[in-house]
Amino acid sequence: MKPPRLTDTTLRDGSHPMRHQFTRQQVATIVQALDRAGVPVIEVSHGDGLAGSSLQYGFSHTSEFDLIETARQHAERAKIAALMLPGIGTRQELKEAVARGVQVVRIATQCTEADISEQHFGLAKELGLETVGFLMMAHMRPPEELARQAKLMESYGADCVYIVDSAGAMLPQDAAARVQALKDTLSVQVGFHAHNNLGLGIANTLAALEAGADQIDGCLRGLGAGAGNAATELLAAVLDRLGLNPGLDVFSLMDAAEYVVAPIMPFQPFPDRDAITIGYAGVYSTFLLHAKRAGAQYNVDPREILVELGRRQAVAGQEDWIIDVALELSRRHQSSARKESRP
């Protein structure tokens, strides 16, 4: 293993549990703390990427462009990154983000849809950006298929391609196999982004590093969607113990998590019943509330709904399946009950 490059995404993935309510002052304080601690890349944007502020994904308290500008002003050494999802962010948003200080763009697609990112990588390269590809929900497809998708992103201009465990559903061997497949296929760097829904964020990141990952992600205090991400301060401590510290100040990151981020967190993400269900089922956390509502309407345990959605490999944008699955399960339960009641 070699020391990886760490991207802290507290100010992007952490926007989900913060309900996209970060302020300029909070961004300034967090960026300063991360920058002083030696974090080389800090991601700042709406939780769903550039232009995510909307009725569908949740409105931001402060324009993400203002937050990006604030981050750039307070980062002496770190690069500022932003997430972009084709279909949400457009050319205009990316150009504005660059004008405000973005130096790295991370372009995210569903893990089977890398082909929709070609124009976005092309524009990013025209703008002189470092480019990173994100293959989301990567637990759903086998390693060899992910490698083919990653190869497309590489051909479009990606400088690194990430395996992204969006649902926190992977086991360590899953993370290792997927990273290894990309390392065997690509000539560019490979990254890994963990979520902690099964309590394996750190373990999966270590497995990815053992398989050759060049870049990894973390959030201070684990502040991220679902049960959160691998905690940046924990990653720093573990990397230091392994002799793989890439220049991070472990104590400074511990202090940043404890005294800067913890006081503003609405709650501490952890693997509670809901988060475990998301990881166990392998679905997006955005399905959870809809499944609970459908479960109440049709008298079905929402966990059953989520597990069935995972079996059907539902992804974001297919929330309409939830009612269909709830109704189908309700009818199935009623049929079973009738059979059991017969003499």
UniProtKB/Swiss-Prot annotation:
Active site (catalytic residues): 16
Q: Which domain of life is it from?
A: Bacteria
**GO biological process entries:** catabolic process; L-leucine biosynthetic process
Q: Which residues bind Mn(2+)?
A: 13, 193, 195
In chain numbering, the residues marked as site (Transition state stabilizer) are 12
- List GO molecular-function terms, semicolon-separated: 2-isopropylmalate synthase activity; 4-hydroxy-2-oxovalerate aldolase activity; manganese ion binding
EC nos? 4.1.3.39
Which InterPro entries does the annotation name? 2-IPM_HCS-like (IPR050073), 4OH_2_O-val_aldolase (IPR017629), Aldolase_TIM (IPR013785), DmpG_comm (IPR012425), DRE_TIM_HOA (IPR035685), PYR_CT (IPR000891)
Positions of the Pyruvate carboxyltransferase domain? 4-254
Q: Please report which protein family the annotation says this sequence is part of.
A: Belongs to the 4-hydroxy-2-oxovalerate aldolase family.
Protein name in UniProt? 4-hydroxy-2-oxovalerate aldolase
Residues bound to substrate are 12-13, 166, 193, 284
* Reaction(s) catalysed (UniProt annotation): (S)-4-hydroxy-2-oxopentanoate = acetaldehyde + pyruvate
CDD domains found in the cross-reference section: DRE_TIM_HOA
Identify the keywords attached in UniProt to this record, alphabetized: Aromatic hydrocarbons catabolism, Lyase, Manganese, Metal-binding
